[in-house]
């Protein structure tokens, strides 16, 4: 069963394969490789990029898309997530894409349902497709991860993007630096070194900004002065390496974690990340719907 719930599930070879497939899709002609398949998108947290990127990817592949949220399912009536997914499986869904506020919600599903679960973000846990599209964007720029320095700035403790990226980038040979307010450092994340903001920016090939995750804080953070203290200001951007790039998983809070003039500057790859997200999610969907042994379906072969 080709679930994708965390980056740690993927070997380096599998990551390379997904990146290669996404590149082939981007450079080639889109085919309706999954025509006739049904996918259910269950988003229990707000989402623009991930939700609609998945939906575009699914429709480009010819899939039938069922889009659901917490107001349109029986979860509102007390039904468990497992029973919801099992219901969708029973009526013919071939895969489920799920975003949920609970960390590791998928542990109650994998091994119990007979369709692939694709994690579109779990609480403060993991965001594997975001990590893959970030890898694709970095690879397009530098061709390799080996020897790169990637700094991740901001609300590290509450960021599933930071958690997914730090692990996989370290595994692929990059050095990861963390920077941000001390209270938002993640003591459990062993895949990066905490340094001062200016030092991190000057040392980096990739400067990755994160928004403040107010929805995961007990009290709303004070954003006054945050940009000058911890964000990417225009002055700090001048100290970046000549070839360095700026990334952000979005949504972007302009003027908070990044100066508004930098969002679409020459070094920015923020909207390129969003574009690459469609191709990565197409590759992930194709991987998920290769031979489903329990259903006895034919394999979908990657295109390259």
UniProtKB/Swiss-Prot annotation:
- The EC number(s) attached to this protein equal 2.1.3.2
Q: Which GO terms describe its molecular function?
A: amino acid binding; aspartate carbamoyltransferase activity
Enzyme class of the recorded protein, top EC level = transferase
Catalysed conversion reaction = carbamoyl phosphate + L-aspartate = N-carbamoyl-L-aspartate + phosphate + H(+)
Keyword Transferase part of the UniProt annotation: yes
InterPro entries referenced in this protein's UniProt entry, alphabetically:
Asp/Orn_carbamoyltranf_P-bd, Asp/Orn_carbamoylTrfase, Asp/Orn_carbamoylTrfase_sf, Asp_carbamoyltransf, Asp_carbamoyltransf_Asp/Orn-bd
The entry's L-aspartate-binding residues are 77, 160, 211
Which pathway does UniProt place it in?
Answer: Pyrimidine metabolism; UMP biosynthesis via de novo pathway; (S)-dihydroorotate from bicarbonate: step 2/3
Keywords from the named record: Pyrimidine biosynthesis, Transferase
**An individual GO BP term:** amino acid metabolic process
Annotated residues for binding of carbamoyl phosphate: 49-50, 99, 127, 130, 250-251
Question: According to the lineage, what is the superkingdom?
Answer: Bacteria
Where, if anywhere, are coiled coils annotated?
A: none
Gene Ontology CC: one annotated term: cytosol
Q: How does it assemble?
A: Heterododecamer (2C3:3R2) of six catalytic PyrB chains organized as two trimers (C3), and six regulatory PyrI chains organized as three dimers (R2).
| Physiological role | Catalyzes the condensation of carbamoyl phosphate and aspartate to form carbamoyl aspartate and inorganic phosphate, the committed step in the de novo pyrimidine nucleotide biosynthesis pathway.
Q: Which HAMAP family match?
A: Asp_carb_tr (MF_00001)
Name the protein family: Belongs to the aspartate/ornithine carbamoyltransferase superfamily. ATCase family.
Q: What is this protein called?
A: Aspartate carbamoyltransferase catalytic subunit
What is the organism of origin for this protein? Bacillus velezensis (strain DSM 23117 / BGSC 10A6 / LMG 26770 / FZB42)
């Amino acid at each position: 069963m080709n679930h994708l719930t965390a980056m740690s599930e993927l070997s380096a070879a599998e990551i390379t394969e997904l990146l290669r497939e996404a590149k082939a899709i981007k450079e080639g002609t889109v085919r309706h490789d999954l025509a006739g398949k049904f996918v259910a998108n269950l988003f229990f947290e707000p989402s623009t990029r991930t939700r609609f990127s998945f939906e575009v990817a699914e429709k480009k592949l010819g899939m039938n898309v069922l889009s659901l949220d917490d107001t349109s399912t029986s979860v509102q009536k007390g039904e468990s997530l497992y029973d919801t997914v099992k219901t969708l499986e029973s009526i013919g869904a071939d895969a489920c894409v799920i975003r949920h506020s609970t960390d590791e919600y998928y542990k109650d599903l994998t091994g119990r349902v007979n369709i692939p679960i694709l994690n579109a973000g779990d609480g403060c846990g993991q965001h594997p497709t975001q990590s893959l599209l970030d890898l694709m964007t970095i690879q397009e720029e530098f061709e390799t991860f080996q020897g790169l320095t990637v700094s991740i700035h901001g609300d590290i403790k509450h960021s599933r993007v930071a958690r997914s990226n730090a692990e996989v980038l370290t595994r692929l040979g990059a050095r990861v630096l963390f920077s941000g307010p001390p209270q938002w450092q993640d003591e459990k994340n062993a895949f990066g070194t905490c340094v001062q903001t200016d030092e991190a920016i000057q040392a980096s090939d990739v400067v990755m900004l994160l928004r403040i995750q107010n929805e995961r804080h007990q009290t709303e953070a004070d954003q006054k002065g945050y940009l000058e203290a911890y964000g990417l200001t225009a002055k700090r951007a001048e100290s970046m390496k000549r070839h360095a790039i700026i990334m952000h998983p979005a949504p972007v809070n302009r003027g908070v974690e990044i100066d508004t003039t930098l969002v679409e500057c020459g070094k920015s790859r923020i909207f390129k990340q969003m574009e690459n997200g469609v191709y990565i999610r197409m590759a992930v969907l194709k991987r998920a719907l290769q031979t489903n042994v329990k259903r006895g379906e034919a394999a979908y072969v990657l295109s390259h």
